């Protein structure tokens, strides 16, 4: 039976629950509600409260569009609303009871930044209790998505969704000791857009010193928009709303109307992915809302700053799933409809960019892919190319840049590949998440439908333990990555280290991505 658990923070007292050796605090505010005068602006400090604040239910999720059919599963967003800048904390009962200074340095802390194409996401989809079970303080954060988080109009404000993440990490720095955590031993980890966000956080001055380690799952440091492309999206949104092209005018639009306009804009992008109209970076990624190189929050391309030494003191794990992008082609039905003509052509394939749009020498590259994937359908080949462009090659580039820069700091760089194939689907995007959280049973809230029957618990044991070990000591249990060997841990029913997996595939993208 759950009991009350109480903790005092800088802003006030929280009442959560305690059960099975874990204390849980839900819906904890880390910034003021981004409503009214604060809408579409950077996060503002929480106003302290008196008395005891209830922290037994999930807080609001950020306003967001309906998940696309390509999500492939029910997205549990909980209650979407304005008071959305909140987070959840799971901590071992002993550590939380002891408060600051547990042992000599407190418990390791892991902060999860969720994915969702910078359009959807909710803390209600993730359960961190098994990290707490294993001696880690786990935090899952909300942050603004879509236009609420990434509207850009070149008006002095940008990347407020990214600044939400920074504000949450500052809250962790200032308060996590009250939950038994060590603010000097924080690991950020995230998947997809969450991992892409971490790639940016590694590079920007405002996040420096807020985390010691980072894990990037199927996302790296390449998905950002140039200011010109992002401004074009922002002004197109204002035109669709019929309001002046100012932040104040868009902020005055009711939430539902703004979300409807975002859906219409995305539908137009998918139906007519013209680079001349939208910009190449938007069309190639199919994501109109992304972090923006504004010259302030993001001074320049994150991968370039990392290559120059930003984040070189941070230990990192970087990884991808073998068939990441196949998920989106399979569940939309496009996978079975791709033709050889479409694969070799220059036109969009039902909204998905063809290989030619990525700068590949199409004929030679497709010959190489066919040779190494005998029997692959045109859809399989498109999935392989898009997996490389979206996540695998950016992950390799990030590992190369970080490992080179970290030679002078001693920080570790580690690479993994998640290779377990779900029945009838493959080792697709997001499939690793319930293994990392060790929630293959009824707690696999978001990604459980992808797993099929009887997913291997031994794989969850291995991945979860590696993540906990890395957060605790900086060592996940396999050799570090360096360009000479490119050691990569391959996670399947059994695990083994492979040097430079699919080197031929990497070679196709030299000088391109």
What residue ranges belong to the model's regions?
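Active-site loop->helix "elbow" adjoining a glycine-rich segment at hydrolase catalytic centers
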Residues: 115, 160, 164, 192-195
